[in-house]
Design a protein with these regions (language model features):
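Short alpha-helix in the alpha/beta-hydrolase fold that links the catalytic acid
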Residues: 228, 241-252
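N-terminal cap/lid segment of alpha/beta-hydrolase-fold proteins
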Residues: 4-32, 36
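Short, surface-exposed "cap/lid" segments of acyl-processing enzymes
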Residues: 32-68
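Conserved alpha/beta-hydrolase
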Residues: 59-87
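Catalytic active-site module of serine/aspartate enzymes centered on a nucleophile-bearing elbow/loop
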Residues: 264-267, 273-305
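Accessory cap/linker subdomain of secreted extracellular hydrolases
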Residues: 147-220
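Short beta-strand/loop motif that positions the catalytic acidic residue
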Residues: 226, 232-234
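Alpha/beta-hydrolase active-site loop
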Residues: 93-114
Length: 305
């Protein structure tokens, strides 16, 4: 457990109580009175740094936390329940819903406030984590506001359908994919034995309850109902979430602050061309800085509120 003393800044491991074992993350506290941000990871096995076992090494959350710390803003970046440092929190990391992640966010808020004395905590969600942040802001107390980074403005079932349609290799499987998305979007599970093997990682029985919980939520509706300050940050070179998503969020929540970043992709790295391979290569590079403007936009927004 990270303990605060007189030595500032504080950087180290921090724990929160999970269902069966500890939830774990990394805290950066540049000063005792620093505003605090909880960084909520995106989809799948994404760790507290923003990396995953499939080879993603871009570490956007670690770089973001470090950059914010240099500007006097504290953070806690976390491993999701059942994964990585939080592996003991639950037995099955797939047996989860958005509500479960919201519950965990509430626990983290309590721990952060007790450790730092912060009156409230900002929720920063990246990609799917933005959906969790919006849902949490609607239900939890002591939330300063929401920072949406590369967050879809449509139900995630629609986003997934669009991503699959853009992949020519999936074309022969689109009837099955559309059926699965349609059924899950209305809360019905799909017979896993009838799902083509190529689609099993997406629609397998183990993840269907989670998909049902995410597909049921419209991020734009959640943003519309959020009275707290909202920052909508979107990169123009993002291959997974578009500027149109950011515009839909802003139309639903006109009180939000948009930040559209040129030449910035989904993992917050600089991509100067339309070349897809060049874009994806940044996901696997561990030596690239964040794109210009990412840290500054968040820092300005938090300090203004």
């Amino acid at each position: 457990m990270l303990a605060l003393g007189t030595s500032i800044p504080v950087i180290g491991e921090i724990e929160a109580p999970g269902l069966q074992g500890a939830l774990r993350g990394t805290m950066i506290l540049p000063a005792q009175s620093a505003p605090m941000i909880l960084i909520i990871p995106g989809s799948g096995p994404t760790d507290r740094d923003g990396n995953n076992p499939q080879g993603v090494k871009a570490a956007p959350y670690r770089l973001l936390a470090e950059g914010l710390g240099e500007q006097g803003i504290g953070s806690v970046r976390i491993d999701k329940r059942g994964m990585f440092g939080s592996h003991a929190a639950v037995e099955d990391p797939n047996a989860v819903t958005v509500d479960d992640y919201v519950q965990d966010a509430g626990v983290w808020i309590d721990v952060i406030r007790s450790r730092t004395g912060a009156g409230c905590v900002w929720l920063l969600g990246h990609s799917e984590g933005g959906l969790v942040a919006l849902a949490a802001a609607e239900r939890l107390e002591n939330v300063c506001g929401v920072i949406l980074v590369a967050t879809a403005g449509r139900p995630l079932g629609e986003v997934l359908r669009e991503q699959l349609l853009a992949n020519p290799q999936i074309a022969p499987l689109m009837d099955a994919a559309n059926h699965a998305i349609d059924e899950l979007s209305v809360g019905r599970q799909v017979d896993a034995s009838k799902i083509p093997p190529e689609l099993a990682p997406l629609f397998g029985q183990a993840v269907q309850e989670f998909l049902i919980s995410t597909f049921a939520l419209d991020p734009a509706d959640l943003a519309k109902n959020t009275s707290k300050p909202v920052l909508i940050m979107q990169g123009e070179r993002d291959l997974q979430v578009s500027v149109a998503d950011a515009k839909r969020l802003h139309e639903a929540a006109p009180h939000a602050t948009p930040a559209i970043l040129p030449d910035t992709n989904h993992v917050l790295k600089t991509v100067a061309s339309h070349d897809r391979n060049e874009n994806i290569a940044t996901y696997f590079a561990d030596n690239l800085p964040l794109a210009p403007g990412v840290v500054d936009a968040i820092s300005r927004f938090v300090k203004r509120h």
